[in-house]
UniProtKB/Swiss-Prot annotation:
Predominant place of localization: nucleus
Acidic residues bias locations: 201-212, 219-234, 250-259
Sorted UniProt keywords: Nucleus
Family per similarity comment: Belongs to the MAK16 family.
Location of the protein in the cell: Nucleus, Nucleolus
Protein name: Protein MAK16 homolog
Amino acid sequence: MQHDDVIWDVVGNKQFCSFKIKTKTQNFCRNEYNITGLCNRSACPLANSQYATIKEEKGICYLYMKTIERAAFPARMWERVRLSKNYEQALEQIDESLIYWPRFIRHKCKQRFTKITQYLIRIRKLTLKRQRKLVPLSRKVERREKRREEKALVAAQLDNAIEKELLERLKQGAYGDIYNFPIQAFDKALEQQEDASASESSEEEEEEDDEESGKREFVEDEDVDESDLSDFEDMDKLGASSEEEKSSGEEESSEEEEEKAPKAKSKGKAPVKGQLIRKRQHVEIEYEQETEPQHKAKVT
């Protein structure tokens, strides 16, 4: 049968213990079931037959309990209870499981559970947070990279100065038809000139558009038929022929008033253009002039 005082006398009172760590100020215990981590009578898991502690496995907290009834069965000595992830519910589970246990054990279990919960929360925050990865670099490689950067900077400045000088000489016409410089610089200069000419042409087009903005024009209607146009042409021809007839009639009226008096009375006033259009289709009139007294011939 297990006797706690005998075990403590053997292990704790200046005797050998494989879990004990001695220091100048205090002794510590490395046993994984120790509730406080200190080597003393109340916290020793070997010298207490009724004992309880909190352990964490893969982010989950468990309550371990040991009683004197299971001391004869080492394989079933510890009873394990899984605690809830909710902090308040886990504390209630500890109180219910350790209701008849010493107050010291119950208080230390809650304290240990609180510490474990805090460092689990801290681990989750660190995993979600971005961390800088420090890559070691030897001094030799660092000096080499620095020298390469300086050389590249000097070469870039030299290339820019040469390009600028060559472009100035090209503008001044110092080379004529021979260009002994990189073709990229020449292409860049040509592109700049093309951009300048394009901008000038666009400005001229804008000015022309501004000048022609107030101009008015007459545009032909696309819905007019050819038959309508032919009718307008016939009207113009008939109007011109009627004017010719009228002028010739006025010249001859003075000479032929006596002969044509009855005919003139029958005709009356000058016909309207609409009537002329209808008569033009059936009647044609011709006039002849002679040295003798003129005679008008009517042809039907």
